[in-house]
């Protein structure tokens, strides 16, 4: 035998043996890497219903006080008279300070209709920021909803005021301070503002002299996200309306605020949830609303307001809030958008969607956008009218394919107009980064030096 060949075979055989032995030793010494198991890691994270007994300890007596009570002509329908009550109550005490809540309640002048079995206990609660925002919410949400639906409606300041008159919202960082001092993660805006809603239902129930309520509860941003927490805790919440705030939780780690994300505790929320967002939403990644929707077994009804920002003064918000109330309490039908898609054909983009509705469809639009900003901030969305083609609606755009599009439907039923939309659909590989938070200020705004 050739000695060189024998040596080669021996060397290779020895190397293989060493490799196998080394691999076996490594397998014994270091366990195989496993991907992060979010479901397992989050199994014992408490949800709102389990946390409530701890949070409840901070609640205080309502001390509900009526400060004015008058009959007024409705601005929305001057033929109607409304009872307008200005009141105040307390919800909780944190860091030695009570949270107080100015509120305005509207009912029909003659409220006997709301004592009938089919209407008894049905109420609307709108969470509002304080200061100048509050009066706008009274005039644009509270009074029109009460006038047109005839359901008792409360607009309250949430998170409210301290006894010295200063705004809790300007001091909302106290929750982060308390969390760090105590190690208790339930100090969270979505939790403490939910307590406000629960106490508001107690105050409303006391005012109306009822044994139970069925409340549509909602508001903008944290005032909306906290309403889902209230729904998980309190069965009196019959529906939730969220206006803006597209925060999502990570699934590659456990974040301290996980307990208060709707998708995480969705098994505790058995009511319809409406999301009224905006294409220029602040501080979140574009398309986060898609993640929010995909994680829910019971999808939200969505309206993404084109070319609007993180704020709560859009006419569509006023309109859709009332539409949601009419849907939940009186069965006002909603349009449903499905099978949203597109096709490239001879230099054109054809947009399609199936739209089903028992309401009268007044307009169907495709909204599309081109982006030159990875944050997708301050972009202009343009629309195309869609027309019925067979069992779908279609619109065609010639030229370059957009970076994203969505479908929106405007309809009317039972005298209540409204809008719903699909989630935005991404069409290209345009980058997407998290937006730098600027509230409702534009991308090019900078603070003064």
Model-derived segments and their meaning:
Residues 118, 179-221, 237:
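Gly/Ser-rich "nucleophile elbow"/oxyanion-hole loop immediately N-terminal to the catalytic nucleophile
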Residues 224-235:
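Short glycine-enriched nucleophile-adjacent loop
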Residues 296-312:
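Catalytic histidine neighborhood in serine/cysteine hydrolases
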Residues 324-368, 382-391:
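Surface beta-strand/loop "capping" patches
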């Amino acid at each position: 035998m050739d000695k060189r060949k024998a040596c080669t075979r021996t060397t290779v055989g020895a190397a293989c043996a060493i490799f196998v032995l080394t691999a076996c030793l490594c397998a014994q010494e270091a366990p195989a890497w496993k991907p992060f198991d979010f479901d397992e890691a989050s199994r014992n994270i408490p949800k709102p219903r389990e946390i409530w007994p701890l949070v409840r300890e901070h609640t205080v007596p309502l001390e509900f006080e009526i400060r004015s009570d008058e009959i007024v002509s409705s601005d929305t329908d001057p033929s109607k008279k409304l009872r307008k009550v200005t009141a105040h109550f307390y919800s909780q005490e944190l860091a030695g300070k009570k949270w107080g809540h100015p509120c305005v309640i509207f009912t029909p002048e003659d409220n006997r209709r709301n004592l009938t079995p089919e209407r008894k206990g049905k109420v609307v609660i709108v969470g509002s920021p304080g200061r100048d925002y509050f009066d706008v919410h009274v005039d644009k949400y509270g009074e029109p909803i009460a006038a047109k639906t005839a359901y008792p409606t409360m607009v309250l300041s949430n998170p409210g005021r301290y006894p010295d008159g200063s705004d809790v919202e300007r001091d909302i960082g106290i929750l982060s301070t308390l969390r760090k001092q105590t190690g208790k993660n339930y100090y969270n805006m979505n939790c403490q503002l939910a307590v406000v809603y629960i106490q508001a239902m107690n105050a409303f129930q006391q005012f109306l002299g009822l044994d139970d309520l069925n409340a549509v509860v909602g508001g903008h941003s944290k005032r909306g996200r906290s309403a889902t927490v209230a729904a998980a805790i309190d069965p009196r919440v019959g529906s939730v309306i969220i206006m803006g705030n597209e925060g999502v939780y990570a699934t590659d780690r456990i974040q301290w605020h996980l307990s208060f994300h709707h998708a995480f505790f969705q098994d505790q929320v058995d009511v319809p949830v409406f999301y009224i967002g905006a294409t220029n939403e602040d501080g979140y990644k574009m398309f986060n609303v898609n993640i929010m929707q995909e994680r829910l077994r019971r999808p939200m009804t969505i309206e993404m307001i084109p070319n609007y920002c993180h704020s709560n003064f859009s006419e569509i918000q006023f309109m859709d809030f009332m539409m949601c109330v009419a849907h939940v309490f009186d069965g006002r039908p909603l349009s449903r958008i499905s099978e949203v898609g597109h096709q490239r054909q001879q230099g054109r983009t054809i947009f399609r969607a199936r739209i089903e509705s028992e309401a009268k469809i007044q307009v169907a639009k495709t909204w599309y956008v081109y982006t030159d900003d990875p944050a997708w901030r301050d972009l202009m969305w343009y629309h195309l009218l869609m027309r019925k083609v067979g069992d779908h609606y279609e619109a065609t755009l010639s030229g370059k394919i957009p970076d994203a599009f969505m479908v929106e439907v405007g309809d009317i039923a039972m005298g209540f107009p409204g809008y719903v939309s699909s989630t935005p659909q991404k069409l290209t590989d345009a980058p997407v980064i998290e937006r730098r938070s600027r509230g409702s200020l534009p991308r090019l705004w900078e603070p003064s030096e």
